[in-house]
Regions:
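Rossmann-fold NAD(P) dinucleotide-binding segment
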Residues: 123-143, 153-154, 158
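Rossmann-like NAD(P)-binding element
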Residues: 81, 108-130, 144
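NAD(P)-binding Rossmann-fold cofactor-contacting core
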Residues: 71-95
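Phosphate/diphosphate ligand-binding glycine-rich loop within oxidoreductases
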Residues: 1-45, 150-152, 156-158, 162-165
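Short acidic low-complexity segments
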Residues: 97-113
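Walker A (P-loop) phosphate-binding motif
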Residues: 214-228
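Rossmann-fold NAD(P)-binding glycine/threonine-rich loop
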Residues: 21, 141-191
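Glycine-rich adenosine-cofactor-binding loop
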Residues: 28-30, 40, 49-69, 79-80, ...
Length: 228
């Protein structure tokens, strides 16, 4: 009731995070889905025909799930509360005709999953040793975790021994903000500018973690030029 217009994704998701006021109209958008899509594109990940496991059923989950089903993926949703998972399933099947979505308990996750998406806060700092999963389905090719602190999450660590490609949620966060700025100002951010923001943010996070672990002590860095 507070908006004059709303874009398709925001309408289907029942979620607006950006409002543009122009020509006497208020228009609502959801840029989270754009940030998520760009994260996958950055890693060369195609969803068409892939079997995707989604952990969680909240706001971030709905964004990931919507993009998956609109791109032709077979989606499996799991979580502690299956009723909430089924509610997300219904919302998506109502919004996207032909969406292929199933709901399973964590004990009965299909083994032929290609992509694992974590939308839950499980594993976020400071409880970074907690994990929403204790193993990855054996066909997993890619792991995306919406958490960005720590930059390598407990879910992502499951992929490390297998050399499975992973991505944390910081790029999604940066890109959804960049798209919001474009909607408001018409200015498009160059990819290099976004990469610079990423590097600086990771650096600040690393320094903060060192301070928390060791206190503000003098550190001596040894190594190749620029590596420190």
């Amino acid at each position: 009731p507070l908006l004059d217009e709303i874009d398709t994704a925001a309408r289907d998701l029942h979620s607006v995070n950006t409002v543009r006021f122009a020509d006497g109209k208020a228009t609502g958008f959801n840029t989270d889905i754009l940030g998520f899509a760009e994260s996958l594109n950055r890693d060369g990940v195609s969803l068409q025909g892939k079997k995707v496991l989604l952990l969680g059923y909240g706001g971030a989950a709905s964004v990931m799930a919507y993009h998956c089903v609109t791109q032709g993926a077979y989606l499996t949703i799991t979580g502690r509360n299956l009723e909430k998972a089924e509610a997300l399933q219904k919302q998506l099947t109502d919004a996207v005709p032909g969406a292929r979505i199933s709901v399973f308990s964590r004990r009965h996750i299909p083994r032929d999953i290609h992509i694992v998406l974590n939308s839950t806060p499980v594993g976020m700092y400071p409880k970074e040793n907690a994990a929403p999963l204790h193993y990855l389905p054996h066909k997993t090719e890619y792991v995306f975790d919406a958490i960005y602190n720590p930059p390598v999450t407990s879910t992502m660590k499951l992929a490390n021994p297998r050399k499975t490609k992973t991505r944390d949620g910081l790029f999604m966060l940066v890109m959804q903000a960049a798209h919001a700025q474009t909607i408001w100002t018409g200015v498009t951010f160059e990819p290099q500018a976004c990469e610079t923001i990423l590097r600086r943010t990771y650096g600040k996070m690393a320094v903060k973690r060192l301070h928390e672990k060791y206190g503000k002590k003098n550190l001596v860095l040894c190594g190749f030029m620029g590596s420190g």
